[in-house]
């Protein structure tokens, strides 16, 4: 059992039969009443994000997630095939299972397949990926106000806000956790 006071970002826990990873947490000590921990969690099975509040000192079960490296091979209709890089065993996911990850997935990309008690619960992308801009608006000359951005479509079809100096054909580094532009590659 893990005390909620020991929460940290990235920790995986089991609550009411669901497996969650901790995205954010905040220890709150009100002037009157008992302390509590407010947390933002992602359900690893469904991908949904939820907020939960725990009483200070409450205990939760840790979830032991096993992961193995697999390479994305190809898509066939609504099915996506991955291969274990050590055993060459293949595994297929449906579009619904990995919908969020498809925004950043390229052929031959290595990902982590997460399993809990023998059940495959999803894939984990690298923290950053390198993608090519396929379409973007031209930057307006003289528009130099701070933090001005424009929309750019990447090779996977994902649309991201980028600085004005980014042009078509450039390679960008995108953070898969925040879905934001990081830098040029």
UniProtKB/Swiss-Prot annotation:
Compartments in which it is found: Cytoplasm
Record GO terms (molecular function): translation elongation factor activity
Any single biological process term in GO: peptide biosynthetic process
SMART domains, alphabetized: EFP (SM01185), Elong-fact-P_C (SM00841)
Main location class: cytoplasm
GO cellular component: cytoplasm
Keyword vocabulary terms for this entry: Cytoplasm, Elongation factor, Protein biosynthesis
One Pfam family here: EFP
Pathway: Protein biosynthesis; polypeptide chain elongation
Family (UniProt): Belongs to the elongation factor P family.
Function: Involved in peptide bond synthesis. Stimulates efficient translation and peptide-bond synthesis on native or reconstituted 70S ribosomes in vitro. Probably functions indirectly by altering the affinity of the ribosome for aminoacyl-tRNA, thus increasing their reactivity as acceptors for peptidyl transferase.
Protein's name in the database: Elongation factor P
Organism: Brevibacillus brevis (strain 47 / JCM 6285 / NBRC 100599)
Encoding gene (name): efp
């Amino acid at each position: 059992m893990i005390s909620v006071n020991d929460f940290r970002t990235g920790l995986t826990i089991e609550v009411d039969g669901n497996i969650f990873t901790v995205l954010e947490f905040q220890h709150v000590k009100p002037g009157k009443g008992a302390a509590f921990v407010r947390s933002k969690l992602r359900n690893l099975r469904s991908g949904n994000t939820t907020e939960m509040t725990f009483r200070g000192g409450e205990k939760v079960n840790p979830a032991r997630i096993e992961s193995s490296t697999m390479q994305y091979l190809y898509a066939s209709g609504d099915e996506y095939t991955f291969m274990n890089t050590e055993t060459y065993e293949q595994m297929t996911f449906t579009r619904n299972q990995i919908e969020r990850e498809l925004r950043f997935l390229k052929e031959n990309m290595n990902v982590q397949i997460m399993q809990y008690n023998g059940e495959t619960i999803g894939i984990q992308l690298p923290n950053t990926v390198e993608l090519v801009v396929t379409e973007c608006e031209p930057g307006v000359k003289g528009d130099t106000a701070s933090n001005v951005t424009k929309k750019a479509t990447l090779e996977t079809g994902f649309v991201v806000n980028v600085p004005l100096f980014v042009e078509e054909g450039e390679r960008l580094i995108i953070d898969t956790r925040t879905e934001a532009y990081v830098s040029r590659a």
